Amino acid sequence: MTDLFSSPDHTLDAQGLRCPEPVMMVRKTVRNMQTGETLLIIADDPATTRDIPGFCTFMEHELMAKETDSLPYRYLLRKKH
């Protein structure tokens, strides 16, 4: 089985940051990405378990994978547009 988290196009380490900073950084990073590129987000704020999926839904990006069973949390999104 392939680890989706192993080769993202971009990585954002948001560890130590608290809401709303992680999502603000994700938005800024995604804005500078090309359509179809992937972003690995590494975070430890419990609010990201709600905020990152919500961001993807609201902005219509694909949340390809998430690991939130233990810290740090990892999310992989694909820019859709």
From Swiss-Prot:
Name used for this protein in its record: Sulfur carrier protein TusA
Keyword terms of this UniProt record: Cytoplasm, tRNA processing
Main localization (coarse): cytoplasm
GO CC term, one of those recorded: cytoplasm
GO biological process: tRNA wobble position uridine thiolation
Catalytic center residues: 19
Organism in which the protein naturally occurs: Citrobacter koseri (strain ATCC BAA-895 / CDC 4225-83 / SGSC4696)
UniProt key word tRNA-binding: no
Pathway: tRNA modification
Family matches, as InterPro entries: Sulphur_carrier_TusA, TusA-like, TusA-like_sf
Entry function: Sulfur carrier protein involved in sulfur trafficking in the cell. Part of a sulfur-relay system required for 2-thiolation during synthesis of 2-thiouridine of the modified wobble base 5-methylaminomethyl-2-thiouridine (mnm(5)s(2)U) in tRNA. Interacts with IscS and stimulates its cysteine desulfurase activity. Accepts an activated sulfur from IscS, which is then transferred to TusD, and thus determines the direction of sulfur flow from IscS to 2-thiouridine formation. Also appears to be involved in sulfur transfer for the biosynthesis of molybdopterin.
Assembly and binders: Interacts with IscS.
Family of the protein in this entry: Belongs to the sulfur carrier protein TusA family.
CDD domains in the cross-refs: SirA (cd03423)
One of the Pfam families matching this protein, by short name: TusA
Localisation: Cytoplasm
Sample GO molecular function, one term: sulfur carrier activity
